[in-house]
Amino acid sequence: AVRSRAVSIGKALGLPATLLDTVADAAAWHDVGKVDPRFQAMLWDGDRMSADLAAEPLAKSGMPAADLTRRRRALRASGLPHRARHEAWSEAVVERYLADQDSPYEGDKELLLHLIASHHGHARPLLPPVHDSAEHDLEAIIHGKNVQAPLPREVPLSSADRFSRLNQRYGRWGLASLESVVRCADMTISAEGS
């Protein structure tokens, strides 16, 4: 749904096909990092067993947004580290997926990874540092392929260089506009309950 919405927005803005494909892929894969078992437990109201038994990973919790006490309790019970960002995990999974492919990504790989990492407004240029002592890998499925990626252990300072190159390539406002396509698609689909 988010991919389709991003395509609609991108077409309305007149994005060229190759750029539209990259934006669409970012929109499709922006939440793959939510497969982290701790994140799933948080979405399942802190219930790790329900999260482990679920047939599919959740993208959103069923908790009322206004019930902050319940949300905080679920967060504590999940074991997620303070300030953890699923965007970092999504970027790591997609980067591993692309590395495992037989041919290089046809679009702008740097833009793709940046749009995934920045879809909640962070990663401009860096995601916040998180101390995460967990030992598990992230396991996701993209296009029917199992992808296993290690948890990010540090803030990749190379993201700042990537951000600089993307600003040179697309311009400050151009890059911000591309980010807003993914963010707007995600937010509007979420608001509609899809």
Where is each model-derived feature located?
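Divalent metal-dependent catalytic cores for phosphoryl transfer on phosphate-bearing substrates
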Residues: G10, G14-S194
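Accessory helical-bundle/CTD segments and flexible terminal tails appended to RecA-like ATPase motors
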Residues: A1-R5
